[in-house]
């Protein structure tokens, strides 16, 4: 039950990331570029936009190799083989959200494997000591106290008085 809840959480997180990208960037420009430059290369030699988004308009498609072609969209309109621009944009957005969601689920699995490995080997191995410091929010704000060095290279140990909860006293620095 908890695995499916985690999967749903990461799916929702992936959809939120896609929505944030769409709000922060000009997603229409990205989808228009995909629609006008990439799809004509995939559809054939004539480089015609076979969509019905503008039947009576002339589409100027400039491919990457530099030729410029002017095509009347009303001559190349196919009812059965065409997919509208909105459907392509929807499929592209869903695919992007799906990929981001599965990436987040994979990252969740990697983190769980790392935590399991750390818990299994923490008594015997010191290589996973960074993980609890990384995951602990309480330790995130604290700076590690390092001993100061004198100019001669001798170590000077600074002794601080601490409160009962482990925080340094501001009066005895």
Curated annotation (Swiss-Prot):
Alphabetical keyword list: Cell membrane, Disease variant, Intellectual disability, Membrane, Neurodegeneration, Phosphoprotein, Spinocerebellar ataxia, Synapse, Transmembrane, Transmembrane helix
Subcellular localization(s) per the UniProt record: Synapse; Cell membrane
Location of Phosphoserine modifications: 169
UniProt topology in membrane: Multi-pass membrane protein
Top-level taxon: Eukaryota
TM region(s), chain numbering: 5-25, 90-110
GO cellular component term of the entry, any: parallel fiber to Purkinje cell synapse
Family label: Belongs to the TMEM240 family.
UniProt disease annotation: Spinocerebellar ataxia 21: A form of spinocerebellar ataxia, a clinically and genetically heterogeneous group of cerebellar disorders. Patients show progressive incoordination of gait and often poor coordination of hands, speech and eye movements, due to degeneration of the cerebellum with variable involvement of the brainstem and spinal cord. SCA21 is characterized by onset in the first decades of life of slowly progressive relatively mild cerebellar ataxia associated with slight extrapyramidal features predominant in older patients and cognitive impairment predominant in younger patients.
Protein's name in the database: Transmembrane protein 240
């Amino acid at each position: 039950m908890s695995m499916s809840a985690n999967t749903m959480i990461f799916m929702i997180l992936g959809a939120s990331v896609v929505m944030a990208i769409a709000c922060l960037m000009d997603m229409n420009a990205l989808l228009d570029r995909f629609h006008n430059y990439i799809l004509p290369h995939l559809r054939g030699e004539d480089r015609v936009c076979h969509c019905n988004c503008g039947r009576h308009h002339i589409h100027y498609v400039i491919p990457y190799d530099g030729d410029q072609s002017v095509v009347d969209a009303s001559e190349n309109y196919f009812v059965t083989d065409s997919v509208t621009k909105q459907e392509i944009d929807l499929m592209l957005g869903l695919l992007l959200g799906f990929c981001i969601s599965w990436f987040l689920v994979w990252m969740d699995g990697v983190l769980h494997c790392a935590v399991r490995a750390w818990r299994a080997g923490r008594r015997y191995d010191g290589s996973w000591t960074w993980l609890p410091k990384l995951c602990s929010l309480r330790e995130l704000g604290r700076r590690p106290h390092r001993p100061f060095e004198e100019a001669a290279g001798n170590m000077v140990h600074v002794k601080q008085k601490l409160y009962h909860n482990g925080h340094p006293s501001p009066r005895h620095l």
